[in-house]
A protein has these predicted regions:
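Short, well-formed alpha-helical segments that are part of the catalytic scaffolds
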Residues: 21-25, 32-43
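Conserved N-terminal catalytic core of the sugar/cofactor nucleotidyltransferase
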Residues: 36-100, 112-113
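Hydrophobic/aromatic residues located in beta-strands of well-ordered beta-sheets
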Residues: 9, 50-52, 132-133
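Conserved beta-loop-beta/alpha segment of the NTase-like Rossmann-fold superfamily
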Residues: 75-155, 159-162
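N-terminal nucleotide-binding beta1-loop-alpha1 segment
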Residues: 1-22
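Short aromatic/basic micro-patch
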Residues: 28, 108, 151-152, 183, ...
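Conserved alpha/beta core of the MobA/IspD/sugar-nucleotide pyrophosphorylase nucleotidyltransferase superfamily
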Residues: 2-5, 159, 163-212
Length: 212
């Protein structure tokens, strides 16, 4: 049983953006690079530490300019990004009781939502050492919610996160341990939306303008 939650965050920024055509994390969104919205969403005292893991020197430069810790690497797999990020956090903060993983391309995710997820995670950790939390939102056309990132893992999963199968991410553990997965539902499904293509980015920008 955890008495005090100390949670880190790995910002996943190692993708090649093949469908986007260029590095989407540097694409402008509502006045600043897309990745900066992930910085804002995770700028909360509920996180003990965070780190961006990337293969892009340009992303590395942006992180340094914004004062966000960053790790530059050249390894190909999603498992590599998870392992490198978590290892870097644990090297500085071995006391971590949980780690959140967030892709850098969800610009509508709000800090209040991240705080809500972290609070729910910490409350549940008081009762069990092995728990996974993810975000969900109403699907609109069925009983099952949309689910997405970020995803939080308690430290009972750290050994497996550090040894994921080649090319696989943390979703492997969600499928392996479905009874340990909790979904924190939010009202706005667009917070889960990512931007794999320029059209998807433009659609989210239009939504921002529409909501004012």
């Amino acid at each position: 049983m955890q008495m005090h939650a100390s949670t880190g965050c790995v910002l996943m920024a190692s993708g090649l953006s093949t469908r986007f055509g260029s590095n989407k994390l540097l694409a402008p969104f509502d006045g600043q690079p897309l990745l900066c919205w992930a910085f804002a969403a995770t700028d909360t005292p509920q996180l003990s530490a965070r780190i961006v893991v990337t293969r892009s020197a340009q992303v590395q430069a942006l992180c340094k300019a914004q004062g966000v810790p960053v790790l530059l690497h050249a390894l190909p797999g999603r498992n590599d990004t998870v392992r490198l990020g978590l290892s870097a956090l644990l090297a500085q903060h071995p006391e971590l009781t949980g780690c959140m993983f967030l892709p850098g391309d969800q610009p509508l995710l709000r800090r209040a939502t991240v705080d809500q997820l972290l609070t729910a995670f910490a409350q549940t950790q008081k009762e069990t050492e092995r728990v996974i939390f993810r975000l969900g939102a109403p699907a609109g056309n069925g009983p099952d919610p949309l689910v997405g990132s970020p995803v939080l893992f308690s430290n009972g999963f750290f050994p497996e996160l550090l040894t994921l199968p080649e090319g696989k991410g943390g979703s492997v553990l969600l499928h392996k341990y479905p009874t340990l997965v909790h979904t924190a539902c939010i009202a706005q499904p667009e917070e889960l939306a990512d931007t794999d293509t320029p059209a998807a980015l433009a659609q989210l920008e239009a939504l921002v303008r529409e909501k004012g």
